[in-house]
Design a protein with these regions (language model features):
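Mobile active-site "lid"/loop adjacent to the S-adenosyl-L-methionine
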Residues: 72-95
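S-adenosyl-L-methionine
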Residues: 33-66
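Conserved SAM-binding loop of SAM-dependent methyltransferases across substrates and taxa
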Residues: 6-20
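Class I S-adenosyl-L-methionine
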Residues: 121-162
């Protein structure tokens, strides 16, 4: 889980991984780690996850090449948190690139791009430019849009590594 936030995706990934699986979850805010730790403990999943207080752009320090089946991102800021602490396109694109190296062949990366806020529109544009340029023989990129929602709905993007 490249962007831990409140821990919901971390919990979901722990459930998918099963007892033998391991989930690495990243965030730069201690608040996110504390909330996630409590959520995992409540559900008996705290031993399946390693909660890492570090930026997602450093995930290659913690995971080996082609070692992950799934990598999830939710760009933006911590729900209910400080809006001044948000993802930026530079570190997000760096993290996506490193994540693609960590992803196994046949693996999937999900990106949930929120385009509101001060940096969200630029981040969305830059991330979409980046994923559009990925080699088609190595990756399949699927971009989804909500057509009937207002106020900058999130944009789900899926990248499958061939």
């Amino acid at each position: 889980d490249a962007t831990m936030g409140k821990g919901n995706d971390t919990l979901f990934l722990c459930e998918l991984a099963g007892e033998k699986g391991k989930v690495l979850a990243f965030d730069i805010q201690q608040e996110a780690l504390d909330v996630t730790k409590e959520l995992l403990k409540t559900h008996g999943k705290e031993m399946q996850a390693e909660l890492i207080l570090d930026g997602h752009e450093h995930m290659d320090r913690y995971a080996g090449k082609e070692s992950a089946d799934v990598i999830c991102f939710n760009f933006g800021y911590l729900p209910g948190g400080n809006h001044n602490l948000a993802t930026t396109y530079r570190t997000s694109i760096e993290a996506i690139g490193k994540g693609l190296g960590i992803l196994k062949h046949g693996g999937m990366m999900s990106l949930c791009i929120y385009s509101g806020g001060d940096t969200g529109f630029e981040e969305k544009e830059k991330i979409l430019e980046y994923v559009k340029a990925l080699p088609g023989k190595e990756y399949t990129v699927i971009v989804n849009e909500y057509y009937n929602r207002k106020n900058c709905p999130p944009m789900p993007v899926f990248i499958f590594k061939e």
